[in-house]
């Protein structure tokens, strides 16, 4: 099941691929996806 979120963005929707810098999550910021989701991962819920 989905956990907290992916460090990704304002234009990011659940299911979209989160693309951000290693330590700077500025590309996007509210992808609702699993707690195991890392920046750059694809969010699926």
Curated annotation (Swiss-Prot):
GO terms for molecular function: metal ion binding. Keywords: Metal-binding, Metal-thiolate cluster. It comes from the Eukaryota. Metallothioneins have a high content of cysteine residues that bind various heavy metals. Belongs to the metallothionein superfamily. Type 15 family. This is Metallothionein-like protein LSC54. It comes from Brassica napus. The lineage of its organism: Eukaryota, Viridiplantae, Streptophyta, Embryophyta, Tracheophyta.
